[in-house]
UniProtKB/Swiss-Prot annotation:
Provenance organism: Escherichia coli O127:H6 (strain E2348/69 / EPEC)
UniProt function note: Antitoxin component of the hybrid type II/IV toxin-antitoxin (TA) system DarTG, which plays a crucial role in controlling bacterial growth and bacteriophage infection. De-ADP-ribosylates DNA modified by its cognate toxin DarT, which neutralizes the activity of cognate toxin DarT. Neutralizes DarT in vivo in 2 ways, by reversing the ADP-ribosylation via the DarG macro domain and by interacting with (and presumably sequestering) DarT via the DarG C-terminal domain. In vivo the macrodomain alone neutralizes DarT toxin from non-cognate T.aquaticus. The same domain de-ADP-ribosylates gDNA.
Annotated family: Belongs to the DarG ADP-ribosyl glycohydrolase family.
Taxon lineage: Bacteria, Pseudomonadati, Pseudomonadota, Gammaproteobacteria, Enterobacterales
Catalytic activity entry: an N-(ADP-alpha-D-ribosyl)-thymidine in DNA + H2O = a thymidine in DNA + ADP-D-ribose
Annotated segments matching region C-terminal domain: 125-343
Region (Interaction with DarT) residue spans: 165-354
Highest taxon, organism lineage: Bacteria
Record-given protein name: DNA ADP-ribosyl glycohydrolase
Length: 355
């Protein structure tokens, strides 16, 4: 029997929990990230199986939790092949038939299922719901809880992250702390730009690249997808948010946990003191640019001068904006957003620090 509900699927009082996964072994955001943290052994087995090409669309990859309380089974349901790609309805249809087989063969009494392929997967929820009802609706001996699309399961703040600091973790956490000290809220967008400017400062000081971030010219300026891994480690212990940081939108606010101020400061002044000059340079560089607009402007101009082969002139930078690699829509947005005075101010500041 199917029942529809909303909320946190991991709290469901059922024998089996369905976790939507890809076939490459990444649980980086949304409910999959929560599964990764709640059931680490499942993550280890699943990741190994992905390396061995054992996780495929249309087939459930099932592990047992071994817990006395809570669910017995974790049903890893592949809704994607690559984590960056969208789901396909045929993968949902085939997977539901394999899920049905599992429920019958194992005599499962209750199961909780998320909105398969909807949300991050890009599928239309009413279409997915119809497929679930068609495949499982006649299983009267199984209590099937269907969690409809909602942000509630994502908006559960992470209670704790890693405690061990590294130079990269300490530097990013300190950048966020300093930003708040200035009286400015710090968004995820701004952290991306701060990280870019820090990496550039480290380059200029000819120090070891502790961040190892792979930046690309994105919608709002330089963007590094792998920064999310670093932020996820800090999330819950050194940084806080109303939702999990990997699920946050560009303008969602991230703040520093002030209870960790002394610990971070001690680490930076001992193990990571080599990178303090780069941190100081970023603090001076962003003076007067402390806002989503200002940091996008500054980081975009810095990208064009350092990676886009532009000259430090207004005409050259504007031509670089016309050719912004993220696409015509985002190039036009930047040209509308940044006037000549803004651009010249940013050019002067970048040249002051990076000439």
């Amino acid at each position: 029997m199917i029942t529809y509900t909303q909320g946190n699927l991991l709290d469901a009082p059922v024998e089996a929990l369905v976790n939507t996964v890809n076939t490459v072994g990444v649980m980086g955001k949304g409910i999959a990230l929560m599964f990764k943290e709640r059931f680490p052994e499942n993550m280890k087995v699943y990741a190994l199986a992905c390396k061995q090409k054992q996780v495929i669309t249309g087939k459930m990859f099932i592990t047992e939790t071994g817990e006395l309380m809570g669910p017995r089974w974790i049903v890893n349901f592949p809704t994607k092949q690559h984590w960056r790609a969208d789901s396909r309805m045929e993968w949902i249809e085939d997977g539901l038939q394999d899920l049905r087989r599992f429920l019958i063969e194992e005599n499962v009494q209750s199961i909780a299922i998320p909105p398969l392929g909807a949300g991050n997967g890009g599928l239309n929820w009413p279409d997915v719901r119809a497929q679930i009802e068609s495949a499982l609706g006649d299983l009267q001996d199984v209590d099937i809880l269907i969690y409809q699309p909602t942000e509630k399961y994502q908006n559960v703040a992470k209670s704790t992250g890693v405690k061990k600091l590294t130079p990269a973790r300490a530097a990013i956490a300190e950048l966020v702390r300093r930003y708040w000290v200035l009286g400015m809220e710090c968004s995820l967008l701004e952290i991306q730009k701060l990280a870019w400017l820090l990496q550039r400062a480290i380059e200029q000081h000819q120090q070891d690249d502790i961040l190892k971030l792979r930046f690309e010219a994105h919608y709002y300026g330089p963007y590094a997808p792998n920064l999310n891994h670093l932020l996820n480690a800090l999330d819950g212990t050194y940084l806080k948010a109303e939702k999990r940081i990997p699920d946050s939108q560009p303008l969602d606010v991230i703040w520093f946990n002030d209870q960790k101020k002394e610990h971070v400061n001690a680490y930076l002044n001992n193990e990571a003191r080599e990178w303090l000059p780069a941190l100081e340079q970023v603090s001076q560089l962003i003076d007067g640019f402390e806002s989503p607009f200002g940091l996008e402007l500054l980081a975009t101009v810095d990208w064009l001068l350092s990676r886009g082969e532009c000259q430090p002139t207004l005409d050259s930078v504007k031509e670089g904006l016309h050719q912004w690699p993220a696409g015509e829509r985002w190039a036009s947005r930047k040209l509308r957003l940044f006037d000549n005075n803004n651009l010249q101010f940013a050019i002067n500041r970048v040249m002051e620090f990076h000439c």
